[in-house]
């Protein structure tokens, strides 16, 4: 499932300015973001069965419910109050607030609509091992690397609105079991992701002051694209090629 991306990026060069770094970041996104993955092409093009879509939503839930954990870790890395305040809204975006639903609630509306038992989804017992390992690696990254790299790893949000728009239109067009209500998560992220990406980009442009720091920012983005890509590789291997590991969710048509 891996694509050869070596020819998609310009040759390595010192990043002598914030503009050069941003150009490099956008090259990385164009070449490595998971909108290029064959599993997403199948998902958005109506080529998956209901059971395969269930498997995707079930596994992706683990990523969604871990995002606020990751963001709490990011907040804990900063002594700067202004940065903590800015980042704090991300927790409410996903966890919700009193009287207001969040992204996790909206994702569960999707899994409910797909016919998955909510308690089973929330237990995460049916997810693929690779899903768990990839998502946990992301949390470890923001905990163990520099605060600058922790923020830089979130820069995949620069490229998220396009995939959300494609997903909304594609899935509504191709699947009779998909409706606007269950796609509410992606609709909300059309406005949330650009706001978050703008802040993260401003932050790394201001705080990555040396070529080495700018390279670290770019490598953090590469790492995050690998986290996302690995999850799709695992889904394709299990639910398209049919190699479901023991203990993982098995769609009805594969039983």
Swiss-Prot record:
Gene Ontology biological process: pyrroloquinoline quinone biosynthetic process; sulfur compound metabolic process
Any matching Pfam family: TENA_THI-4
Keyword Oxidoreductase annotated: yes
Catalytic activity, EC: 1.3.3.11
EC class name: oxidoreductase
Pathway membership, UniProt: Cofactor biosynthesis; pyrroloquinoline quinone biosynthesis
Record-annotated disulphide pairs: none
Keyword Oxidoreductase listed: yes
Keywords: Oxidoreductase, PQQ biosynthesis
Molecular function in Gene Ontology: pyrroloquinoline-quinone synthase activity
SUPFAM superfamilies (alphabetical): Heme oxygenase-like
Enzymatic reactions: 6-(2-amino-2-carboxyethyl)-7,8-dioxo-1,2,3,4,7,8-hexahydroquinoline-2,4-dicarboxylate + 3 O2 = pyrroloquinoline quinone + 2 H2O2 + 2 H2O + H(+)
InterPro entries: Haem_Oase-like_multi-hlx, PqqC, PqqC-like, Thiaminase-2/PQQC
Record family assignment: Belongs to the PqqC family.
Job description of the protein: Ring cyclization and eight-electron oxidation of 3a-(2-amino-2-carboxyethyl)-4,5-dioxo-4,5,6,7,8,9-hexahydroquinoline-7,9-dicarboxylic-acid to PQQ.
Protein name, per record: Pyrroloquinoline-quinone synthase
Organism, scientific name: Cereibacter sphaeroides (strain KD131 / KCTC 12085) (Rhodobacter sphaeroides)
